[in-house]
């Protein structure tokens, strides 16, 4: 199953989490805005690459672009960002399950990116995001490994 992650979904989640943190925290925190998107996109690539390494053995192919074109101001997230992955043991997933896996990958990139960005300014928030990313990664790994086992156990009729 090949998935193209949606950069806008990732940045929307980053901005939403940042806004919710500012709105609900007793402490004052700086809001992440679209002005920081060029830097965030660099970190998004880094986090995506980390995920691909962490999923080694479960990834068939991956594709990542190397850089953004020269940003125009005001900067927006409509400039394509290539974050593609082909997952092993996933061809039998229903369309709904494929969308769920895609959304979880986008969530892991968003949580990892914002967690990385918040490390110095809000260590508790950063740890919380990293813990959520790790939990989602573990769940995805388990899902792909269980599906591989189910595929291996199916009887074959090659006659």
Language-model features: where?
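Conserved short "hinge" loops at termini or chain/domain junctions
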Residues: 1-98, 139-159
């Amino acid at each position: 199953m090949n998935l193209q992650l949606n950069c806008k979904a990732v940045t929307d989640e980053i901005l939403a989490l940042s806004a919710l943190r500012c709105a609900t925290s007793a402490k004052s925190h700086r809001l992440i805005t679209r002005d920081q998107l060029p830097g965030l996109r660099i970190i998004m690539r880094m986090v995506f690459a980390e995920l691909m390494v962490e999923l080694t053995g479960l990834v068939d192919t991956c594709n990542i672009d190397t850089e953004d074109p020269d940003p125009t101001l005001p900067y927006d997230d409509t400039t394509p960002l290539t974050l593609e992955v082909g997952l092993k043991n996933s061809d039998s997933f229903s369309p709904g399950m494929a969308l769920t896996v895609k959304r979880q990958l986008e969530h892991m990139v968003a949580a990892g990116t914002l967690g990385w960005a918040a490390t110095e300014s809000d260590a508790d928030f950063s740890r919380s995001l990293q813990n959520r990313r790790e939990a989602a990664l573990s769940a995805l790994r388990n899902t792909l490994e269980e599906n591989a086992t189910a595929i291996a156990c199916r009887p074959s009729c090659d006659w």
